[in-house]
Amino acid sequence: MKTSSAKAKGRNLQKWVVSQLVEHLGANPEDIESRPMGSSGEDVIMGVQTRELFPYSVECKNQEKVNVWAAYEQSTANCGKYEPMVVIKKNHKKPLVVVDAEY
């Protein structure tokens, strides 16, 4: 797969997560956005209002073979004071969410 195609898959998942937060939490669309591909940090950028509704740091992985533990470690490294969360997806499957079971 081309790098541009892989980035497009990741970007689409990030946008899907943003749309779900807007739809289900009532988050203001201007207070939440998908991070540009290739940028460091969490994949979904949230403002103060959205953080109050959803105190998670989101890492998105849209890959056929995901190392869940490595993805969770990446989310943990980027989470700051928020709870790390990984959204994983593969072709033709629904997205799943990984969070610490003891949170």
Q: Which positions does each model-derived feature cover?
A:
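Catalytic phosphate/metal-binding cores of nucleic-acid and nucleotide-processing enzymes, i.e., regions
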Residues: M1-Y103
